[in-house]
From Swiss-Prot:
Residues binding Zn(2+): 173, 175, 186
UniProt-listed InterPro entries: MPN, RadC_JAB, RuvA_2-like, UPF0758, UPF0758_N
Keyword terms: Hydrolase, Metal-binding, Metalloprotease, Protease, Zinc
Positions of short motif JAMM motif: 173-186
The protein's name in its UniProt record: UPF0758 protein H16_A3033
Ranges where the MPN domain occurs: 102-224
BP terms from Gene Ontology: proteolysis
Length: 228
């Protein structure tokens, strides 16, 4: 039975219009995006198959094109649609960090960092450069490493802070396939960054570690960081 033949209260689009997006399951929301399924399976069936195969929304949105288009009912158009969703979310969150009021808490920053770093298979060191009102003026990937290691140079971070005339910086890196537990080298790097930035009167506000959907603030274990 196609979705068009379902009772109106069970159709994802009608259900969303009636009760709001929060009332829908992951598969139902994904089905609205996919629009159609394939011969013998509805868009909801296809959405459930994708979630089962990839295990989570995060893994699905991070999947390579070849893996996605190998699923019957998926093609380049649907792959492009799936790629657009997290990118739009990242851009919307980045916009919110540039609002005149700046950010009034860590939630938006954490969400932005999750969306940016969680899907990556390699380690990346990211810097958010802030103006005196805590508005983000730039987000830059400063260093990129292998699965387990990235070389970070505090002087390069300080140089970019001067380029952006930043008053403060938030840094973050991911632990692909790891945990958010900071290593001793993570803590040493944080102290070294804070000392280097102090020399040019720039505050290091926080250092976050992202692993999957988990995120940890090093302000909790580093007394040099004021936190957000």
């Amino acid at each position: 039975m196609t979705i068009a033949n379902w009772p109106a209260c069970e159709r994802p689009r009608e259900k969303l219009m009636e009760s709001g997006a929060a009332a829908l399951s992951d598969a139902e929301l994904l089905a609205i995006l996919l629009r159609v399924g394939a011969a013998g399976k509805s868009a909801v069936d296809l959405a459930r198959e994708l979630l089962h195969r990839f295990g989570s929304l995060t893994a699905l949105f991070a999947a390579e094109g070849r893996a996605l288009t190998s699923v019957r009912g998926m093609g380049e158009t649907k792959y492009a649609q799936l790629q657009a969703i997290p990118e739009l979310a990242r851009r919307a969150l980045a916009e919110s960090l540039r609002l005149p009021t700046g950010f009034d808490g860590p939630a938006a920053v954490r969400n932005y960092l999750r969306l940016t770093l969680a899907p990556l298979p390699h380690e990346v060191f990211l810097c958010l450069f802030l103006d005196p009102r805590n508005r983000m003026v730039a987000s830059e990937e400063m260093f990129r490493g292998t699965l387990t290691r990235t070389a970070v140079y505090p002087r390069e971070v300080a140089r970019q802070a001067l380029v952006h005339n930043a008053a403060g910086i938030i840094v973050a890196h991911n632990h692909p396939r790891g945990t958010t537990a900071p290593s001793q080298s993570d803590i040493r790097l944080t102290h070294e960054l804070a000392r280097t930035l102090d020399l040019i009167d720039v505050r290091l506000l926080d250092h976050f570690i992202v692993a999957g959907q988990e995120i940890r603030s090093l302000a909790d274990c580093c007394d040099r960081l004021p936190g957000l």
